[in-house]
């Protein structure tokens, strides 16, 4: 169970903005943002599909998700691609519906 009182919660956006590395801690809980909503997970690695499902973007095939790296350009995440939430500079994620001709 994940609680806000957990001392091992790492807010990835704040670490990225502060230019700090997230400690690799087996008990870590990652706090991250997709669009304007904040989520918690104990999983360090999530696929693009999992991120879209967490954000309620169903079916995931109808949406795109981009990873925002602090100080860099957005990078598209594929549905099967795994993202490391502890990767240096990962700030947040943004989604957008795909045009029916995209995919």
Indicate residue ranges for each PLM-predicted region.
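Ubiquitin-like/PB1-type beta-grasp interaction modules and other compact soluble beta-rich domains
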Residues: 1-103
């Amino acid at each position: 169970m994940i609680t806000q009182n957990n001392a091992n919660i790492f807010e990835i956006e704040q670490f990225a903005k502060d230019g700090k590395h997230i400690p690799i801690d087996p008990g870590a809980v990652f706090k991250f943002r997709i669009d304007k909503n904040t989520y918690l997970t104990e999983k360090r690695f999530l696929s693009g599909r999992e991120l879209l499902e967490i954000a309620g973007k169903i079916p995931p095939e109808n949406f795109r998700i981009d990873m925002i790296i602090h100080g860099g350009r957005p990078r598209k995440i594929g549905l099967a691609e795994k993202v490391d939430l502890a990767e240096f500079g990962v700030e947040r994620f943004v989604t957008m519906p795909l045009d029916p001709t995209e995919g």
